[in-house]
A protein has these predicted regions:
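Conserved, structured core segments of small domains
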Residues: 1-96
Length: 96
């Protein structure tokens, strides 16, 4: 499992120009079963995406198709982790 941390590198009004395209990118990856949860940081300096995929390299290829990355309004950092413990109803996400 992975945490994708997006950090805006341009002002919010510039980021906003690509928000609809970014949302479409997110929706496509939710439909593929890759993204599990996402949302903006507070304060709004970027966003977080939790993803489930077999390899970091595959995920990097996907993230590099994000309109925020293509248009250079955001940078990203990917952190891999094992979801060893989950809340009720999320047992299917557990990894060992």
């Amino acid at each position: 499992m992975f945490i994708i941390e997006l950090t805006y590198v341009k002002p919010l009004e510039e980021v906003g120009k690509y928000m609809e395209e970014h949302k479409k990118f997110l929706e496509e990856n939710y439909e593929e079963g890759i993204f599990i949860v996402s949302g903006p940081m507070v304060p709004r300096v970027g966003g977080i995406i939790i993803a489930s995929l077999d390899s970091k390299e595959e995920l990097e290829k996907i993230v590099n198709k994000d309109p925020f990355i293509i248009n250079k309004v955001s940078s990203y950092k990917i952190t891999e982790f094992l979801a060893a413990v989950t809340g009720e109803g999320l047992e299917s996400l557990r990894e060992s």
